[in-house]
């Protein structure tokens, strides 16, 4: 079919595509936690950015509403950042060992 380098490159591209698809599925199904206020507010979020659980320490219910809202927003943002870090790590692992052309950068 393909000779030498081109055939090898096609096999590598197919392997990379399979690895990336597997990594994307793992990311979509993973759960990460975001926290704020030293763990007083916790958010459990999936890799699809769906919030599964919001946990608020009872001690915060007597505090002002604005502070609680800020802590919830910070915990959500922390969870999103945790997903992004994990996503980059998994995608980098999916392409590890692939001989990509010099200067080629993956879009993640």
UniProtKB/Swiss-Prot annotation:
Predominant location category: cytoplasm
Protein name per Swiss-Prot or TrEMBL: Nucleoid-associated protein Mmwyl1_2533
Keyword NAD belongs to the record: no
Subunit structure: Homodimer.
InterPro entries registered for this protein in UniProt: YbaB-like_sf, YbaB/EbfC
A GO term, aspect molecular function: DNA binding
Keywords: Cytoplasm, DNA-binding
GO cellular component: a single term: cytosol
Classification of source organism: Bacteria, Pseudomonadati, Pseudomonadota, Gammaproteobacteria, Oceanospirillales
Family label: Belongs to the YbaB/EbfC family.
Compartments where found: Cytoplasm, Nucleoid
Biological function: Binds to DNA and alters its conformation. May be involved in regulation of gene expression, nucleoid organization and DNA protection.
Species in which this protein is naturally found: Marinomonas sp. (strain MWYL1)
Gene3D superfamilies linked to this entry: Nucleoid-associated protein YbaB-like domain
Annotated PANTHER family: NUCLEOID-ASSOCIATED PROTEIN YBAB (PTHR33449:SF1)
């Amino acid at each position: 079919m393909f000779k030498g380098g081109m055939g090898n490159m096609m096999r590598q591209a197919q392997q990379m595509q399979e690895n990336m698809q597997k990594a994307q599925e793992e990311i979509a199904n993973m759960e990460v936690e975001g926290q704020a206020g030293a763990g007083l507010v916790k958010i459990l979020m999936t890799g699809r950015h769906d919030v599964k659980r919001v946990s608020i320490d009872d001690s915060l219910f007597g505090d002002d509403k604005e502070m609680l809202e800020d802590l919830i927003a910070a915990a959500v943002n922390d969870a999103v950042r945790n997903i992004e870090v994990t996503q980059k790590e998994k995608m980098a692992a999916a392409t590890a060992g692939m001989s990509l052309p010099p200067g080629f950068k993956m879009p993640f």
